Amino acid sequence: MVGVVVEHRRIDHPWQSHRWQAVDVLPGEVSAADWTVLGQGEGWVRYLAGAAELSLFPGECETYAYNLQSREPAIYVVLRKTDDARGIKLLGATVDPGEAHAHADTGDDLVEALPLPGPVREWMEAFVAVHYVERTKWKRKRDRADPEAMAIRTPGQRGYEDADYEDED
């Protein structure tokens, strides 16, 4: 479980008046209510958007290991645009780069990569140590092509079917 901190900032843009951005994740349970104001300044407000449950699955260990081995391991926060007064909601958080990429591909979700907090990293490392089995990579080889497979057959050759033709004279 992590708490997600988002920021609402006014921007000078011809088509948008503001921007939402995930700025921090707080490891562990959060005691404050969703959308509690954490801080504000001129043109910006930070909220605790809510809590997000992190789940790990043994079948996805390869992507978790990839995330942990990257130069900057990340946790991905997914925000979704809505039609309500706030205009955005917390959809969740993930440590799976593939899942984050899938959300980014939809076009409706805002995905932010944030630094992976230490306790979450340790939890992931322990999970990967238990469940990760490195798969051997092998290159698939094609069957050798039979150059005679499409050849024209003559009588007496293997594969030639002798048909009885009768002349109609």
Question: Which stretches of residues belong to each language-model region?
Answer:
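Terminal targeting/leader modules
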Residues: 1-116, 133-169
